[in-house]
Swiss-Prot record:
Compartments where found: Cytoplasm
EC number(s) given by UniProt: 6.1.1.7
NCBIfam families in alphabetical order: alaS
Protein name (record): Alanine--tRNA ligase
Native organism: Pseudomonas aeruginosa (strain UCBPP-PA14)
Taxonomic classification: Bacteria, Pseudomonadati, Pseudomonadota, Gammaproteobacteria, Pseudomonadales
Protein family per UniProt: Belongs to the class-II aminoacyl-tRNA synthetase family.
Role played: Catalyzes the attachment of alanine to tRNA(Ala) in a two-step reaction: alanine is first activated by ATP to form Ala-AMP and then transferred to the acceptor end of tRNA(Ala). Also edits incorrectly charged Ser-tRNA(Ala) and Gly-tRNA(Ala) via its editing domain.
Reported cofactor(s): Zn(2+)
InterPro entries: aa-tRNA-synth_II/BPL/LPL (IPR045864), Ala-tRNA-lgiase_IIc (IPR002318), Ala-tRNA-ligase_IIc_anticod-bd (IPR018162), Ala-tRNA-synth_IIc_core (IPR018165), Ala-tRNA-synth_IIc_N (IPR018164), Ala-tRNA_ligase (IPR050058), Ala_tRNA_ligase_euk/bac (IPR023033), DHHA1_dom (IPR003156)
Cross-referenced Gene3D superfamilies: 2.40.30.130, 3.10.310.40, 3.30.54.20, 6.10.250.550, Bira Bifunctional Protein, Domain 2 (3.30.930.10), Threonyl-trna Synthetase, Chain A, domain 2 (3.30.980.10)
Domain notes: Consists of three domains; the N-terminal catalytic domain, the editing domain and the C-terminal C-Ala domain. The editing domain removes incorrectly charged amino acids, while the C-Ala domain, along with tRNA(Ala), serves as a bridge to cooperatively bring together the editing and aminoacylation centers thus stimulating deacylation of misacylated tRNAs.
GO terms under biological process: alanyl-tRNA aminoacylation; negative regulation of DNA-templated transcription
Gene of this entry: alaS
Length: 874
């Protein structure tokens, strides 16, 4: 079976078992700052397992795209050199949220693997592990499924602590956890290795193909395991691994999917399609890089973008080792799209963008290699001994993207070695940081957990009645909040919008007889709206009825900005291109902020075009239409999804100007585009590599902004004794007059310097046949001193000159040496000494150098160094 056929068979099997087929989530985890990348099928269901979110289904199946670059699971440096390490892989999974448990999960796995209709693997080739004390799973496998005891292995705590086992999974130090059962395929005695749990288990004979995790406990901070009221199931089977089994090969790189990518990689590089590890690196890395870019990641020097940059550069380096000339990596994207584009349509949609990003980064890396070589040369020049320190190798690798193997090659050419142990210590420290960042980073038992959902009334108005279903103080559920206490109120229904999609939460108040709760902010936990605030009067109790009143003026101003954000997004794609993707936003009552992908600053004419397009849509005054539909129908209509946002099966589609703007959005908006009134961009700039930011105002705030600009124009006109009509002419004349005066001043300075030069030349002293002049001239800048040094060199002949002075509280220094002395005396060396004396730095050419410092009190001492410098140098 081909990889694509296995993927489809798996999803179809579980659909027939009542599971909902759920699309792969983005590689950028939605609303989860604790994860760098999606690295498991369960990531998108994390809140379901935590009990913070309820979905319309209790059974799900997915083929999840995953990235593991670094850390304990998949060391980047191993990719290409082992049979099963990858930066990108697909995880097939089936999930139960409080529905079926161990029995069904085990039977489903066995049926899919061994059933004649499905994978039809020989049963005698399958081994199974269970957690040592999980008798329930063991009995299901042996007594119901029929796996013989000799192919069953109990795995205990093998990692030095209770429940620290290959067969016990935990979300963190506290929270949901439980035993797991793993299924292994036996490749046969001709392959070295032993069964799981044996000393030879790391061999290639027995390969894990499926893991079933049974979340049945909640571990509290004291280490006690409490049974969960609704146990869940999380499973994972690597598509590449099971494909290798079914295609009778021992390396993932031999499966159909990789064979095509290896061929395309060899053609792009211009090398033989053989078993070279470097070729496997390129074929693997094109997958992770392309999918990351398709999901909105761009190369940068931090976070996710930094990981992407490292993977791209590693691929380029390995391509260069194989003889690649020029850019090649981006040429492989087409082969990947042909291989995986049907299963992941985002690859097809983003192909041109992916190719452009990769080519740009390849070109940048060529420059980086050149820079890295210069830095390495500097470090080698200062090296004492024959070993390049590990921290230097790591700095080149980690900070400058300089490949370790290249550093090693250069060291070998110089008969040097690198400190591999020191480098590994630095790498391990980085891995530990990665491991720490990959944990979920939360205490499950301290989270606010609310059963049920709050019905949102805010689309219909800004007020409504509700009943208090829960109260929280300091994160703990309480029955009552007293006057003056801060807390959180949860209602059964509310008009208050909870912060999401970049729109801030509503503010206002909750009121009943003798009671008032001032709502400062509204957020969401699962499906519940949390009203944060303080009891201003009386007290609140669970079960009490209240009137909820949103601050209408703030809500309306926020709606103007949110609707304008949608119009701006559409305009950006018109003006800049379809590669524009939203990277984040902030919408409140004062302004809007919109971050998006783009590679360069926006030109002034483009900014004007954006404003013109948005304001034209505002003037059209079209109706803002909303529709509730399923996610697939919405995407088929071309609705754009918000970056980093999670969507359920049913979504709200917001349309403006017909098909001018169609987006998925749950926020509050105007009724017609004309309600926005006016749109004005206030700033544009870069916030990260490949990410730009526009800030703007609307409505009354836009009018106030323009009125303020008008007042500034009037003030500027008044300063130049003109009017708004002739302001540009007045400013032009003023600038021309200023240039004329500056030119006149330079001429006067030159005359003064010439006169000073005549006076100074007489002060030169002769040392060993050379004239030495050191003088203090306060108030002159570096340019004037340079001109004076040139003049003095011509006057004095064979000479060394050091001039300095104080200007605006800082020291300015210039040194000069005539050409006939530069073989013995260098101006740059003199400058280093003089600048150091005044607490600064300097340098330059052998015949001319500049510097400066901050300690003017030491200037005379610095100038005195000139004579000693000549005495020692001649």
């Amino acid at each position: 079976m081909k990889s694509a056929e296995i993927r489809e068979a798996f999803l179809r099997f579980f659909e027939e078992k009542g599971h909902t087929r759920v699309a792969s989530s983005s590689l950028i985890p939605a609303n989860d700052p604790t994860l760098l990348f999606t690295n498991a099928g369960m990531n998108q269901f994390k809140d379901c397992f935590l009990g913070l979110e309820k979905r319309a289904y209790t059974r799900a199946t997915t083929s999840q795209k995953c990235v593991r670059a670094g850390g304990k699971h998949n060391d980047l440096e191993n990719v290409g050199y082992t049979a099963r390490h990858h930066t990108f892989f697909e995880m097939l999974g089936n999930f139960s949220f409080g529905d079926y448990f161990k029995r069904d999960a085990i039977h489903y796995a066995w049926e899919f693997l061994t059933g004649e209709k499905w994978l039809n693997l020989p049963k005698e080739k399958l081994w199974v592990t269970v957690y040592a004390t999980d008798d329930e799973a063991y009995d299901i496998w042996t007594k119901e499924v029929g796996v013989p005891a000799e192919r069953m292995v109990r795995i205990g705590d093998n990692k030095g602590a209770p429940y620290a086992s290959d067969n016990f999974w935990a979300m963190g130090d506290t929270g949901p956890c439980g035993p797991c059962t793993e299924i292994f395929f036996d490749h046969g005695p001709e392959i070295w290795g032993g069964p799981p749990g044996s000393p030879e288990e790391d061999g290639d004979r027995y390969i894990e193909i499926w893991n079933n995790v049974f979340m049945q406990f909640n571990r509290t901070a004291d280490g006690v395991m409490h049974p969960l009221p609704a146990p869940s199931v999380d499973t994972g089977m690597g598509l590449e691994r099971v494909s290798a089994v079914l295609q009778h090969v021992h390396s993932n790189y031999e499966i159909d999917l990789f064979q095509n990518l290896l061929k395309a990689s060899a053609e792009a590089i211009g090398c033989a399609n053989d078993d070279a590890p470097s070729l496997k690196v390129v074929a693997d890395h094109i997958r992770s890089c392309s999918f990351l870019i398709a999901d909105g990641v761009l190369p940068s020097n931090e976070g996710r973008g930094y990981v992407l940059r490292r993977i791209i550069r590693r691929a380029c380096r390995h391509g260069n080792k194989l003889g690649a000339r020029g850019t090649f990596f981006h040429k492989i994207v087409a082969a990947l799209v042909a291989e995986m584009g049907d299963a992941f349509p985002e690859l097809k949609q983003q192909q041109a963008h992916i190719e452009r990003v990769l080519k740009t980064e390849e070109e940048q890396f060529a420059k980086t290699l050149e820079q890295g070589l210069k830095i390495l040369e500097q470090d080698l020049a200062e090296l004492q001994g024959s070993v390049i320190p590990g921290n230097v190798v790591f700095k080149l690798y980690d900070t400058y993207g300089f490949p370790v193997d290249l550093t090693n090659d250069i060291a070998r050419e110089r008969e040097l070695t690198i400190d591999e142990d020191g480098f590994e210590r630095e790498m391990e420290a980085q891995r530990e940081r990665a491991r720490a960042s990959s944990a979920f980073g939360m205490d499950y038992n301290s989270l606010v957990k609310v059963d049920g959902e709050t019905r949102f009334l805010g689309y219909q108005g800004v007020s409504g009645a509700g009943q208090i279903v829960a109260l929280f103080r300091d994160g703990q559920a309480v029955e009552r909040l007293e006057e003056g206490e801060e807390g959180v109120v949860v209602l059964d229904q509310t008009p208050f919008y909870a912060e999401s999609g970049g729109q801030v939460g509503d503010s206002g108040y909750l009121e009943a007889a003798g009671v008032r709760f001032d709502v400062r902010d509204t957020t969401k936990a699962g499906g519940a709206h949390l009203h944060h605030g303080v009891v201003a009067r009386g007290n609140l109790s669970v079960g009490a009825a209240v009137k909820a009143e949103v601050d209408a003026s703030v809500r309306q101003a926020t709606a103007l900005n949110h609707s304008a954000t949608h119009l701006l997004h559409a305009a950006l794609r018109q003006v800049l291109g379809d590669h524009v993707q939203q990277k984040g936003s902030l919408v409140d009552s004062q302004r809007l902020r919109f971050d998006f992908s783009h590679f360069e600053a926006i030109k002034a004419e483009q900014l004007k075009a954006l404003e013109d397009i948005v304001n034209a849509e505002i003037r059209r005054n079209t109706e803002v239409e909303t529709e509730e539909t399923d996610i697939d129908t919405a995407k088929a209509k071309g609705a754009m999804a918000l970056f980093g946002e999670k969507y359920g099966d049913q979504v709200r589609v917001l349309s403006m100007g017909g098909d001018f703007s169609v987006e998925l959005c749950g926020g509050t908006h105007v009724s017609r585009t004309g309600d926005i009134g006016l749109f004005k961009i206030t700033s544009e700039g870069g916030v990260a590599a490949g990410v730009r930011r526009i800030e703007a105002v609307t409505g009354a705030a836009a009018l106030a902004y323009l009125n303020g600009a008008e007042e500034q124009l009037k003030e500027a006109a008044s300063l130049v004794k003109g009017s708004r009509d002739n302001l540009l002419d007045k400013l032009g004349a003023l600038l021309e007059r200023n240039r004329s005066l500056e030119k006149e001043l330079e001429q006067l300075k030159a005359k003064a310097a010439s006169a000073a030069g005549d006076d100074l030349s007489a002060a030169a002293v002769e040392i060993k046949g050379a004239k030495v002049l050191a003088a203090r001239l306060d108030g002159l800048d570096g340019k004037a001193l340079l001109a004076l040094v040139d003049q003095l060199k011509n006057k004095l002949g064979r000479a060394v000159i050091l001039l300095g002075g104080e200007l605006d509280g800082k020291v300015v220094l210039v040194a000069g040496v005539t050409q006939d002395l530069t073989g013995q005396l260098k101006a740059g060396e003199l400058m280093k000494q003089a600048a150091a004396a005044v607490g600064g730095k300097g340098g330059g050419r052998p015949d001319m150098a500049q510097g400066g410092g901050t300690n003017a009190a030491k200037l005379d001492e610095a100038l005195a160094l000139a004579q000693r410098f000549v005495e020692q140098g001649l």
